[in-house]
């Protein structure tokens, strides 16, 4: 099992698919990485040489923000919005949907379990 960016990637999968197990690398970035390292798209992780794994690590470290660094960056951005007091920051602070979704009904995932109100029946 190869370890890239602090993640154990599965050995029996194709390299393009296995790289997507790293937070911050999707289909497009995985395809770009194997193109830069010049690895065939149908190659499996178990067939990679140590040199190829090292090249993949170097490309990811140099060109991409992944795993903990990416999570930290996103957290800092959200905190910045909350400190500014802008609308998006207020929505984050209140635990409500940020991108304009309705909240009269739905939005239960973001708002948490329904709170019952005593004496409210039809």
Curated annotation (Swiss-Prot):
Superkingdom: Bacteria
Record flagged with keyword rRNA-binding: yes
One cellular component (GO) term of this entry: cytosol
A biological process term (GO) from this entry: translation
Annotated stretches, region: Disordered: 95-122
Record's keyword terms, sorted: Ribonucleoprotein, Ribosomal protein, RNA-binding, rRNA-binding, tRNA-binding
GO molecular function, one term: rRNA binding
PROSITE patterns in the cross-refs: RIBOSOMAL_S13_1, RIBOSOMAL_S13_2
Coiled coil regions, renumbered to chain: none
Reported function: Located at the top of the head of the 30S subunit, it contacts several helices of the 16S rRNA. In the 70S ribosome it contacts the 23S rRNA (bridge B1a) and protein L5 of the 50S subunit (bridge B1b), connecting the 2 subunits; these bridges are implicated in subunit movement. Contacts the tRNAs in the A and P-sites.
Family to which the UniProt record says this protein belongs: Belongs to the universal ribosomal protein uS13 family.
Subunit and partners: Part of the 30S ribosomal subunit. Forms a loose heterodimer with protein S19. Forms two bridges to the 50S subunit in the 70S ribosome.
Protein name, entry field: Small ribosomal subunit protein uS13
């Amino acid at each position: 099992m190869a370890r890239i960016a602090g993640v154990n990637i599965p050995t029996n999968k194709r390299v393009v698919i296995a790289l997507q197990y790293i937070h911050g690398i999707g289909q497009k970035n995985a395809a770009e990485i194997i193109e830069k390292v010049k690895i065939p798209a149908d190659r499996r992780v178990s067939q990679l040489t140590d040199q190829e794994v090292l090249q993949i690590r170097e490309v990811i470290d140099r060109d991409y923000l992944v795993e903990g660094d990416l999570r930290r960056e996103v957290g800092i951005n959200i905190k910045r919005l909350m400190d500014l007091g802008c609308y998006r920051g207020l929505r984050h602070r209140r635990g409500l949907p940020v991108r304009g979704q309705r909240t009269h009904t739905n939005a239960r995932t973001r708002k948490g379990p329904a709170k019952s109100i005593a004496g409210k029946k039809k």
